[in-house]
Amino acid sequence: MKIEQGFVLTRHARDIAGQTQIELWLATPSGPTQLIIRGERPVFFIEQSASQEVIRIAAELSITPSLSPLSLRSFAGHPLAACYCNTIRDSQILAEKLAQADMLILEADIRLADRFLMERFIQGSIEFTGQIIDFGHYRQVQQAKCRQGDYLPALNMVSLDIECSEKGLLYSIGLDSPMDSRVIMVGQPEPAETPIQWVEDEYQLLKALIAWFEQFDPDVIIGWSVVDFDFRLLHKRAEFHKLKLTIGRAQQPSFFRTASQTQQGFISIPGRVVLDGIDTLKTATFHFRSWSLESVSQELLGEGKAIHNVHDRMDEINQMFRHDKPSLAHYNLQDCVLVNKIFAATHLLDFAIQRSRLTGVELDRIGGSVAAFTNLYLPQLHRAGYVAPNLQPENWIASPGGYVMDSIPGLYDSVLVLDFKSLYPSIIRSFLIDPLGLIEGLKLPIGKQADHAVPGFRGGQFHRTKHFLPEMIEKLWAARDEAKRNQEKAFSQAIKIIMNSFYGVLGSSGCRFFDARLASSITMRGHEIMIQTKQLIEARGYQVIYGDTDSTFVALGGQYSQQEADNIGHALVSEINQWWTEHLKQEYALTSILELEYETHYRRFLMPTIRGSETGSKKRYAGLKGDGDNEQLIFKGLESARTDWTPLAQRFQHQLYQLIFHGQDPESYIRTIVEQTLAGQLDEQLVYQKRLRRRLHEYQKNVPPQVRAARMADDINAKLGRPLQYQYRGTIEYVITVNGPEPKEYSKSPIDYQHYIDKQLKPVADAILPFIGKQFDELIAPQLGLF
């Protein structure tokens, strides 16, 4: 039988006629392929001593499990048996009943399709054989046998966007892909530059969408809030018309569900992956001031949508649908094109594919750090003779966070930043920190010999040879270095996120491997390393003014040229790395992977005080680096770097620091900005933009300004018969007026300029002016008298 290659798009398991069926949809060089695997039995693990009780309880439920004693043990050391059932339903019912009877059941939450792939080390890429039936549009493989593969797919992608009325009636659906680009529009045919497929009504619109998917058959669907908005509404309208949305492969219907607590939507479409632009960018650690399509496309591409305000947009869409459908089609398709351009510019599809190849998580998985770790770790753990523990819901001890040193405030010349390269991953590798290593290490005495354990913190100790995590990180580290050399940005970013998430997973009570001894052995070792490194630097005559997690800020004590600073930086890291290598070898008989790097030389650097005190602040600083065309002003944690400060404060801070860092007098600039603010010349810079982190009705006692503005906006929306915007979180833009906060789109009262002087300009100025002997209030006193 010929062995073929493919890439897993979707996975699903269900019960059919008394046995299970796993359905995997793949992208292959020969087109879409459906693998059918029958008869895989769901399994969970029980203590061998409970076998008879399990059989008794199963009999009461008319379930006949198969129990197999194993050589595997729990982390507590108890011998285990595997409990197999014929169907997923039987397995779930039995596991639930045993849990109610307070019996230990392990790994009952691992889904059948996930376990099937995981235990075969299948991570995205797959090799398969079986009986192939060709259905033209796709192939089906019966009695499929699978193993790990190494195949990089070329997936075809469509960008989808809908336009609708404020009541949620569909007007049109835009689809943009290399295969076909069109808008399906309700209405009578009329000439248009945009390719339009005209349909009679909403029902025919949905039928045309189903036919489009059947004809052009994309692997991936992308969009902006495409799950929570577009697909939610498409399903709602299909339900209204009693129509199954059969947009899956093999004419299978898509399935939409809403999480009960968060109201977040989830969609599954057999054979097709749905990637939401916002969620995928967040998973790939992108940050934007606003997540609107307009804002992100302006920032990334320098182009955006034609209509900005949400209500203007709604009114204009309604107008276009009634009187100018060709313009609506152009607008609809433009959104699809923008999303395609954003995905191309950020390599998001490549990122999702590489993440799946590295960890085995689904292409459309949001976040997924715990799932990634479980996928990689569980099969190795089984082969080492253990079954994974369950989540520990209570009684867990929080581990200390990263090291943050008290800063020494001041305005400095020549500050170096020295960074430990991937500090937490390198601690895991150097000190052999690992869940299995902890269980095995606790059986040994602590010491330097080969048969002794490596000491950790809070009672943790680690086996010198029985571990997986250090090797997992070593492989990822090497892959990332290669990706960097090959300039594969998406691959490098995917590896970095996964590697850094491993500490977060071990330190999260949402992970089955969470143990305070693991997390603390990483963070507390980090504290120790940072404190010792500070002492080593200060012993060489330099002043450490701040330290944060893995970065150390070193004041050289005067003005140094770039070359002089570089020489000092390189010498320092070389000496300190050598010290750590010798220290780990002598104290622990370990090989150090710790690597301090010389990161940056700031020609001028400000470490501010905490507002209203003389104490140095944390995670807040600014610096000037480079010169000429390469000069850069960097802000961390200050107003310029925070999205909840107004553009006025951000621009003021940027220019003020620019002047002071270059030794220029800022007095005239400060007075001018205050004058312009009071004269109403900078009103467009006074808009606050803040996220509502809860539902509007949940704000009871403390009602911040953004909530007051949001409530006012939705009260007005209700009176005007417009949809409410802010009930379920969201982002609000508002201004402070003499009558308090008002939403930007409905603001009527005069602006409270004094508020902006006191709350936006003054805090920015007060952070830096005292270091050059000036006071904001004294500088602006004459201006205030004029107004």
Short names for language-model regions:
Residues 1-278, 283-389, 397-416, 420-476, ...:
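The two-metal-ion catalytic cores of nucleic-acid processing enzymes
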Residues 307-312, 504-508, 543-553:
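Core alpha/beta catalytic barrel or barrel-like domain that forms the active/cofactor pocket
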Residues 15-28, 32-34, 343, 349, ...:
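DNA-dependent DNA polymerase catalytic subunits
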Residues 81-83, 276, 509, 513, ...:
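Short, hydrophobic beta-strand segments
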Residues 46-47, 522-526:
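Short, surface-exposed ligand-recognition loops at beta-strand->loop->(often short) alpha-helix junctions
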Residues 195-202, 519, 523, 562-566:
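Flexible, glycine- and charge-enriched loops at secondary-structure boundaries
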Residues 181-194, 505-520, 524:
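Gly-rich Lys/Arg/Thr-decorated short loops/hinges at beta-loop-alpha junctions or inter-strand turns
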Residues 479-485:
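Catalytic P-loop NTP-binding/switch module of NTPases
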